[in-house]
């Protein structure tokens, strides 16, 4: 929500109201302009060598416009700092007014350039705080700001159905979590799902966390076109996870089903699934359920 609604939508609207042509951010991601269209973005990021001329989406469906007529988004040159996963929702109208000057640089290069220019941020420690939660303690934030959402309830074993204990509130847990459950068991137990209807935390053995299929809603595709046929690509389900082979099945507009070649761990509702072809960002959406 921070990137979508504040850093981009609000700031783009504000910059346009102030008469600026572009908004530049420090995100590590590369942007390529349509063929023949000049861009003020970092010149090192605009090479056609970034990826094949047409993406998998344009070759899989005739209903899609060819990618060389649209802005295209790519992973950063510095793979360790790449932030493309959190920018999948950017639209063509937004990309046309954005610049990402750090996309072709590594973090050490950025620090060196900052020192040369005497910027106070040159040696500032990196921050990965949650937006608007400076201490990064989202559990404290929820308890203080949304106490009604923190309701204790049962912890149930996914295979036996037995009640193992009591949780402290579903928003305080995440799929795949092992520590902090407050359980004593002869086997390691992990959160496999959260049943919000019954306020029940479901736990089970490690293999119970594996899923092969996810469903996603609120899907946004960088090209702006919607595929008419299934297509193969790479799918990434966490910010620092590896993108892995999958097949994508378009459903209703804005919804997708993603089937992985291999079972994946902790496909968590609420997290994003982002689709790639090589380094190119195709789009993504919010995971609603997995199976």
Where are these regions (language model features)?
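Intrinsically disordered, low-complexity repeat regions of secreted/extracellular protein precursors
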Residues: 46-68
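Nucleotide-activated chemistry modules centered on ATP-dependent adenylation/adenylyltransferase
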Residues: 1-44, 68-282, 286-290
